[in-house]
A protein has these predicted regions:
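S-adenosylmethionine
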Residues: 165-240
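S-adenosyl-L-methionine
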Residues: 1-100, 128-167
Length: 270
């Protein structure tokens, strides 16, 4: 059973939220908290699930700040998640382009979907991992215009998406081996899931397409009329992404986005 299952419904959810509030005012080691829960009669499985989630929320503060205390995570999902400050920049692109309903394909725990929904856009979040789908559903629980779908992005029919009112896509292809995006990185974009060429081809049907790629992507894989942007947060290179012309007001080419606590700087590549 997934460690998420016990906390995604009553009484697990209420227990998680009450303990989160208590820890904010009365911090204590999570190991001690787990022992106290079991001693009070809480089932071991539920106690473990709650403590695991509280630990993930603590770790997630580096990427999501205080918002993390209201979110649900998986270990793999947190590792792969877009930092909230970067996801906010993605969401701003979609809103500025006039998009109204964005499909977040390969959404993971929903960092980008959350930022998109937070700007008032409808979002369809799709992931093949049941744990990730459960997490993103919890994370989007306050947004009426958000929908979560469990499914393989490789099976997506973009014409059907367009028929559902989707007018923009953000994709995060799986770039690691293993069922849970395990250990080994896949460097060839045509071996990603879905392949980069497939994602780029979606723009023939839905013109607004953004895709998260490996920062070390070879320039040969970047379409001449798309915009590639590398993002640094606090001096660390954290991601690269490609944007179709409809999502790139800066035009084709390459740039880097430098984000810090009080500084935003964009430098174009010649």
């Amino acid at each position: 059973m997934s460690t998420l299952t016990p906390i995604l419904s009553s009484p697990g959810w209420e227990l998680l939220e009450s303990l989160q509030a208590r820890l904010e005012s009365q911090p204590m080691p999570l190991r001690e908290l787990g022992a106290a829960l079991r001693a009070s009669g809480v089932e071991a499985e539920l106690a473990a699930a709650v403590v695991t989630q509280l630990a993930l929320r603590q770790a997630a503060r580096k990427k999501f700040g205080p918002v993390a205390t209201h979110m649900v995570f998986t270990r793999d999902g947190l590792e792969q998640a877009t930092r909230l400050v970067v996801a906010a920049r993605h969401a701003q692109r979609f809103r500025a382009s006039g998009a109204t309903r964005v499909a977040d394909l390969g959404c993971g725990i929903g960092g980008d979907a959350l930022a998109i929904a937070g700007l008032g856009l409808d979002v369809l979040a799709v992931d093949i991992d049941p744990d990730a789908a459960g997490a993103v559903a919890a994370n989007l629980r306050d947004f009426e215009g958000a929908q979560v779908r469990l499914g393989d992005v490789m099976d997506v029919d973009v014409e059907e998406l367009a028929g559902e009112g989707v007018d923009a896509i953000f994709a995060d292809p799986a770039r690691r081996t293993g069922a849970s995006r395990g250990s080994a990185r896949i460097t060839n974009p045509e071996q990603w899931s879905p392949p980069l060429s497939t994602v780029l081809g979606w723009a023939r049907t839905i013109e607004r397409v953004g895709v998260k790629v490996a920062p070390g992507i070879a320039y040969d894989f970047i379409p001449a009329d798309w915009h590639a942007q590398w993002v640094s947060v606090g001096g660390d290179l954290v991601e690269a992404s490609l944007w179709s012309p409809a999502l790139a007001p800066e035009g084709r080419g390459r740039s880097c986005l430098l984000l810090a606590l009080s500084l935003l700087h964009i430098c174009p590549f010649l």
